[in-house]
């Protein structure tokens, strides 16, 4: 009789908001999971770390809607593991701190299911760090207390409990207490805490949407209500709050709080998204284009078979690199096929895409446009035959300049781009109509063309509501041909150069 080998459950702390705060262990477990059960506050970027085969189940609890019960979630973990699946239970913050991780672990133990607890950065620690409010300081606080705003049944702790806490510790951190902040602050003052004690409320900690309000203890409830703050939020009380003005680093990042649309496929936007987060902004990744096979795959395979007969093979995009090497593999060849053929790339990102395939570019254009690449090839001399695997529709300047220089140039479509539709379009329209975007980043002419086609005749009107930023003058010219108003054009034609230009744009607008 065959028996199923039991699986295992990992209770993984997802961290508080910034997906970069996931632990290395947590990241590796997500990448190998069969099933992921995730909370409402889990950042979507973390789910992108999961393999395509992974089953993703949303078990988050949200206010105002019907939520899965804790018993149901626990039974799912047990059933999945007993059926032989490896399960990641992705929990916001740290699974052992006010996250019911201990309850789930006990249930797994009693059911005989193997489990592991993987710590995460708690929301308390993140709120403290990202708001610039340390929980302890040698001169101000040597003790700190974490407490939830309600008891097991969801009821407020008794006023006497808050009064006892008032002077028992120097820093008080209250989680999930916004619904009772008025009663909590009154009880702390009644218990002997000075009404002038500095206090703060930190909402959406470690995310670009983070908001922080500070005020004396007697006024913090009123101030947070006036600012419209609600859960998820942390209430902090103590003299350490006075250090915020000097230590607030996160909301001083150059693009803090802005929402930037990246109209590229998710698997190609991860590096761009991370660069955006480093500057304090929130990347919104929505594919405006889909990458598909060329109309004549046989022509691409034929070019791959004969690549050694060319003096140079020029790549103008990472997509072209990936598709060409797929064709190379289909005909039973690998990087050794390039023996005798030099390789050129239009820019550093394209050159970087070659490295995993075992190729280092012999030439990377100093200026990241086709004309510059053509000039540098022409300067080399002795180049007779050139192969260019590229998109079906692309600018003709590169092959035309090379042909004008006496070279034989074969242009082979390696892939085709087309506008993405369905849910991508609907989500994009919703964000634009509701004013949920600040900036739209165009990183190529094809993303401009595809996005305009996706939005239809109202494209110019819809896009007039956001700041349009283009990676270079060619992309900018494409946008202008569609009657789009471009606010930012990068001088350095890379994502980092584009974000630098965007920073300068906003800095000049406030100076």
Model feature map: region roles:
Residues 34-36, 56, 134, 172, ...:
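Short, well-ordered beta-strand core segments
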Residues 5-16, 58-63, 145-150, 285-290, ...:
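Short, basic, glycine/proline-bearing loop/turn elements
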Residues 27, 103-115, 131-138, 329-334, ...:
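A glycine- and small-aliphatic-rich helix-loop capping segment at beta-alpha/alpha-beta transitions
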Residues 2-11, 82, 87, 106, ...:
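Beta-strand/loop-alpha-helix module characteristic of Rossmann-like adenine-cofactor folds
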Residues 1-19, 24-121, 126, 226, ...:
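Class I S-adenosyl-L-methionine
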Residues 29-41, 198-203, 343-347, 467-472:
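Short internal beta-strands
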Residues 44-45, 63-65, 122-126, 143-146, ...:
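Short gly/pro/ser/thr-enriched loop/turn and capping motifs at secondary-structure boundaries
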Residues 17, 69-73, 79-83, 207-511:
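Signature of uroporphyrinogen-III synthase
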């Amino acid at each position: 009789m065959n028996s199923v080998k039991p699986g295992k459950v990992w209770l993984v702390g997802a961290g508080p908001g910034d997906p970069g705060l996931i632990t290395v262990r947590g990241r590796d477990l997500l990448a190998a999971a069969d099933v992921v059960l995730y909370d409402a506050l889990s950042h979507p970027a973390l789910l992108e770390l999961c393999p395509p085969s992974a089953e993703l189940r949303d078990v988050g609890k949200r206010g105002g809607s019907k939520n899965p019960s804790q018993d149901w979630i626990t039974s799912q973990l047990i059933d999945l593991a007993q059926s032989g699946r490896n399960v990641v239970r992705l929990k916001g913050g740290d699974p052992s701190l006010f996250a019911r991780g201990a309850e789930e672990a006990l249930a797994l133990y009693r059911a005989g299911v193997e489990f592991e607890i993987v710590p995460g950065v708690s929301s308390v620690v993140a709120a403290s760090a990202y708001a610039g409010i340390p929980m302890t300081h040698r001169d101000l606080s040597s003790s700190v207390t974490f407490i939830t705003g309600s008891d097991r049944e969801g009821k407020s702790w008794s006023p006497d409990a808050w009064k006892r806490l008032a002077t028992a510790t120097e820093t008080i951190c209250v989680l999930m207490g916004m619904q009772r902040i008025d009663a909590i602050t009154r009880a702390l003052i009644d218990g002997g805490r000075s009404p002038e004690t500095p206090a703060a409320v930190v909402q959406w900690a470690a995310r670009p949407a983070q908001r922080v309000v500070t005020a004396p203890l007697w006024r913090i409830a009123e101030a947070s209500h006036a600012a419209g703050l609600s859960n998820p939020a942390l209430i902090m009380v103590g003299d350490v709050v006075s250090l915020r003005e000097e230590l607030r680093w996160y909301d001083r990042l150059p693009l803090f709080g802005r929402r930037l649309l990246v109209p590229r496929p998710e698997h190609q936007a991860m590096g761009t998204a991370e660069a955006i987060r480093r500057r304090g902004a929130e990347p919104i990744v929505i594919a405006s284009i889909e990458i598909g096979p060329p109309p004549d795959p046989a022509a691409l395979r034929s070019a791959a078979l004969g690549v050694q007969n060319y003096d140079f093979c020029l790549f103008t995009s990472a997509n072209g690199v990936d598709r060409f090497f797929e064709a190379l593999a289909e005909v039973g060849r690998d990087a050794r096929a390039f023996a005798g053929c030099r390789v050129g790339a239009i820019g550093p990102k394209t050159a970087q895409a070659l490295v995993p395939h075992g190729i280092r570019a012999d030439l990377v254009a100093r200026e990241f446009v086709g004309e510059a690449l053509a000039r540098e090839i022409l300067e080399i001399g002795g180049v007779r035959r050139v192969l260019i695997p590229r998109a079906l529709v692309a600018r003709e300047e590169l092959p035309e300049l090379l042909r004008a220089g006496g070279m034989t140039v074969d242009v082979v479509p390696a892939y085709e781009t087309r506008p993405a539709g369905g849910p991508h379009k609907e989500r994009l329209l919703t964000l634009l109509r509701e004013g949920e975007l600040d900036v739209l980043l165009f990183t190529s002419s094809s993303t401009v063309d595809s996005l305009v086609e996706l939005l239809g005749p109202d494209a110019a009107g819809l896009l007039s509501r956001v700041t349009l930023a283009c990676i270079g003058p060619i992309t900018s010219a494409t946008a202008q041909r569609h009657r789009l108003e471009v606010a930012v054009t990068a001088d350095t034609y890379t994502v980092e150069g584009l974000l630098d230009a965007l920073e300068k744009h906003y800095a000049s607008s406030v100076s």
